[in-house]
Regions:
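Bacterial N-terminal signal peptides
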Residues: 7-16
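Extracellular carbohydrate-recognition regions
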Residues: 21-44
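Extracellular beta-strand elements of beta-rich domains used
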Residues: 29, 192, 210-214
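Short carbohydrate-recognition loop motifs
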Residues: 51-72
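Extracellular/lumenal carbohydrate-interaction signature centered on repeated Trp-anchored short motifs
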Residues: 76-87, 161-164, 185
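Solvent-exposed strand-to-loop "edge" motifs in beta-rich extracellular domains
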Residues: 90-96, 119, 175
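Extracellular/luminal beta-rich ligand-recognition
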Residues: 107-152
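Extracellular beta-strand ligand-recognition surfaces/modules
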Residues: 109-114, 150-151, 156-160, 164-204
Length: 217
């Protein structure tokens, strides 16, 4: 009888406790994966950003080098933001874009960007995005609409003012950010993109991306 009651209590407790969501890795950063990612060259850019795979003691990484270039790597992936709303990014800027005004069209380049995308219409132009950036000139926490479209918000998660040529890990609550910046209650995102771009400034940037994933906390 005692054993039966214990079993009932255990089952009841299991039903009450929330289910722990496992982290969701977005990129593997392997040569094989690199071949499958969607490459999108920015319209008007003279060159494509060069992306190669490397590794260190913490695993694989993506190295991006842009010389008067702009192209991104995209991946369609569904992420349930009710379970795993937090994006985690580890990145490093080796060569930044010192002196540019990132909130203007002429200076709208970033050594590091990770776009989180939500489809909100029939065409890509209707999509809304939060653009998490590694800034060369602005402080962490600064944000503004892209000078090209209000449907994309630039949000500074890291800056070379504080971290130049060193690895840094940051996180952000994507669900809260879509509500804050777009007034959207988003339960699921549709894609992630990475880009290092210098097509507006005509400069050179070198950045490394590693271990991008979503988690519950």
């Amino acid at each position: 009888m005692i054993k039966y009651l214990f079993k009932i209590c255990f089952i009841s407790l299991a039903l009450i406790l929330p289910v722990k969501a496992e982290p969701i890795q977005v990129f593997e950063f392997t040569d094989q994966e690199l071949k499958t990612l969607k490459v999108r060259k920015v319209r008007g850019a003279d060159n494509k950003t060069n992306y190669i795979i490397g590794s260190n003691e913490n695993g694989n990484y993506l190295k991006a080098e842009a010389n008067n270039a702009a192209s991104g790597l995209g991946k369609e992936i569904k992420i349930n933001l009710n379970l795993t709303p937090i994006i985690n990014i580890t990145w490093k800027v080796e060569k930044n874009l010192d002196g540019i005004k990132e909130d203007t069209k002429k200076g709208h380049d970033f050594a590091g960007r990770v776009f989180v995308i939500k489809k909100t219409g029939a065409t890509p132009l209707s999509n809304k995005a939060v653009n998490y950036v590694f800034s060369s000139n602005n402080k962490v926490g600064n944000n503004w609409p892209s000078p090209y479209t209000k449907k994309s918000i630039d949000n500074v998660l890291s800056t070379t003012i504080e971290h130049m040529n060193e690895w840094v890990t940051v996180k952000a609550n994507v669900k809260k950010d879509f509500k804050k910046f777009h007034d959207l209650d988003v339960n699921e995102i549709d894609g992630i993109a990475i880009m290092t771009d210098t097509d507006n400034s005509k400069m050179t940037a070198i950045t490394y991306y590693q271990n991008i994933y979503f988690s519950a906390q």
